[in-house]
């Protein structure tokens, strides 16, 4: 077959494989044992049967720093599925790597899961743990309004969100506590005097920074 025909056949084979995959409704069983009042996610969430066969890690609410407010749980400001992300992130952040760095958490949820609100939920939990400085990195400067909305949606309207470029690169941001919003492109930029935005951000965070990044 020609290259075009080969690609068409490959695409058809892939479609047939996808049709054969079995999907199951996802339920955060481990979380519900610790937070029985958690609400269902507003949209239907599924996972393929292979993933469903793998047991999720135990939720350790007692060991990890979990300070999620009752209002967030009982009013469904975060669904059970989103709360699960906040809890697993907190558990992961409790670990320290061999080089002394705090362990990170990767969120691979697909479209419609409310990832922005999940990130806001992680900040909400850390804020209530006493960590008052956080950095939100995004692809677009316009998404700062989404970050503000997401924090408001998890009952944190008083957390101030400011853009890093509200200040000149040579100046340390005067935001004492809150979320500093920065885009990837701004993060690698310099001003006309050669001052780097990354250095500016590092100065704001300080050596004792323990917030979300």
Describe the role of every protein-language-model region:
Residues 4-14, 26, 31-77, 102-106, ...:
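SF2 helicase/translocase NTPase motor core
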Residues 16-19:
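Short linear sequence motifs
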Residues 75-103:
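N-terminal pre-P-loop "Q-motif" helix
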Residues 85-94, 122-123, 148-149, 199:
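Short, well-ordered amphipathic alpha-helices
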Residues 109:
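The Walker A (P-loop) glycine that initiates the GxxxxGKT/S ATP-binding motif of P-loop NTPases
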Residues 114-124:
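Motif I (Walker A/P-loop) of helicase-class P-loop NTPases
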């Amino acid at each position: 077959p020609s290259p075009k025909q080969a690609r068409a056949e490959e695409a058809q084979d892939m479609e047939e494989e996808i049709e054969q995959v079995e999907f199951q409704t996802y339920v955060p069983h481990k979380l519900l044992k610790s937070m029985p009042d958690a609400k269902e996610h507003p949209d239907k969430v599924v996972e393929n049967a292979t993933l469903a066969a793998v047991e999720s890690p135990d939720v350790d609410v007692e060991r990890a720093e979990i300070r999620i407010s009752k209002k967030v749980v009982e009013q469904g400001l975060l669904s059970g599925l989103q709360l699960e992300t906040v809890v697993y992130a907190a558990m992961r952040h409790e670990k320290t790597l061999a080089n002394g760095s705090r362990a990170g958490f990767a969120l691979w949820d697909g479209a419609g899961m409310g990832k922005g609100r999940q990130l806001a939920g992680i900040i909400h939990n850390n804020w209530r743990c006493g960590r008052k400085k956080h950095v939100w990195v995004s692809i677009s400067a316009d998404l700062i309004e989404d970050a503000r909305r997401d924090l408001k949606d998890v009952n944190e309207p008083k957390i101030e969100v400011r853009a890093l470029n509200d200040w000149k690169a040579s100046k340390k941001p005067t935001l004492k506590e809150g979320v500093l919003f920065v885009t990837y492109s701004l993060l690698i930029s310099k001003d006309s005097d050669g001052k780097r935005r990354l250095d500016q951000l590092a100065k704001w965070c300080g050596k004792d920074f323990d917030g979300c990044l």
